[in-house]
Amino acid sequence: MPELPEVEVVRRGLHSHVVGKTIGAVRVHHPRAVRRHEAGPADLTARLLGARITGTDRRGKYLWLLLDGRDTALVVHLGMSGQMLLGAVPRAEHVRISALLDDGTVLSFADQRTFGGWMLADLLEVDGSVVPEPVAHLARDPLDPRFDADAVVKVLRRKHSEIKRQLLDQQVVSGIGNIYADEALWRAKVHGARIADALTRKQLTAVLDAAADVMRDALAKGGTSFDSLYVNVNGESGYFDRSLDAYGREGESCRRCGAVMRREKFMNRSSFYCPKCQPRPRL
């Protein structure tokens, strides 16, 4: 699933190419792509017709397009395999929605697994920010200028469960998925099974700082692409997968100490870690 860096790469691409453009005809090619828009496909297409895009924004793994003179936004969730693509014509297999812009560009939403989609949602003011209603419950992410690491540390120190579980909880801190959780924990030298309330403030701060740092590094390299499911708006893959220190490196040498990296099951996922740098907690 695209995590914060990948979604931010897409948002930046959209901001550069669609802000100031007006939406013309919109076609929904697969109803699942608009299943979160409760009023249905016809309502979505009618309300988008003639809307001018004035900006883009993101929180965690959600992004949205701001529309001129409206108190609603077009919310996009990429799900497992969603792609926002720009071109003269719909340019990908699995195109679920296409929108013609006034300069002739087609904005396409492609989604092989159909877990993502578009919806129009009301904008709300929450904690000093204006966000779409489906995003209102999400915590700020580590790249948000108003992210308060000290406040998150206080929350984590009240959580009696694994630190990795907390990093994946979008109501504690948003935008972090399995890949960047493992990378942050490796950088901070903390095993994901450590209990959050047993970690010191210094350790928890180190984990959050590492999460922000690794996502900035990933963003600079276009995100992480293991296959063709994640690409930017031009259809190009990111290349941070070449720089991963933990995720996917079972059996390889730790880049820091040389120990053999391990993999274990966690929450129906795989966790990758160094047994020397990140010793597993004793039961």
UniProtKB/Swiss-Prot annotation:
Alphabetical keyword list: DNA damage, DNA repair, DNA-binding, Glycosidase, Hydrolase, Lyase, Metal-binding, Multifunctional enzyme, Zinc, Zinc-finger
Cofactor notes: Binds 1 zinc ion per subunit.
Record-linked Gene3D superfamilies: 1.10.8.50, MutM-like, N-terminal (3.20.190.10)
Coiled-coil ranges (or none): none
Signal peptide residue numbers: none
One Gene Ontology molecular-function label: damaged DNA binding
Gene Ontology BP terms: base-excision repair
Cofactor(s) the protein requires to work: Zn(2+)
Catalytic reactions of this protein: Hydrolysis of DNA containing ring-opened 7-methylguanine residues, releasing 2,6-diamino-4-hydroxy-5-(N-methyl)formamidopyrimidine; 2'-deoxyribonucleotide-(2'-deoxyribose 5'-phosphate)-2'-deoxyribonucleotide-DNA = a 3'-end 2'-deoxyribonucleotide-(2,3-dehydro-2,3-deoxyribose 5'-phosphate)-DNA + a 5'-end 5'-phospho-2'-deoxyribonucleoside-DNA + H(+)
Stated family: Belongs to the FPG family.
Subunit relationships: Monomer.
Function summary: Involved in base excision repair of DNA damaged by oxidation or by mutagenic agents. Acts as a DNA glycosylase that recognizes and removes damaged bases. Has a preference for oxidized purines, such as 7,8-dihydro-8-oxoguanine (8-oxoG). Has AP (apurinic/apyrimidinic) lyase activity and introduces nicks in the DNA strand. Cleaves the DNA backbone by beta-delta elimination to generate a single-strand break at the site of the removed base with both 3'- and 5'-phosphates.
Protein name per UniProt: Formamidopyrimidine-DNA glycosylase
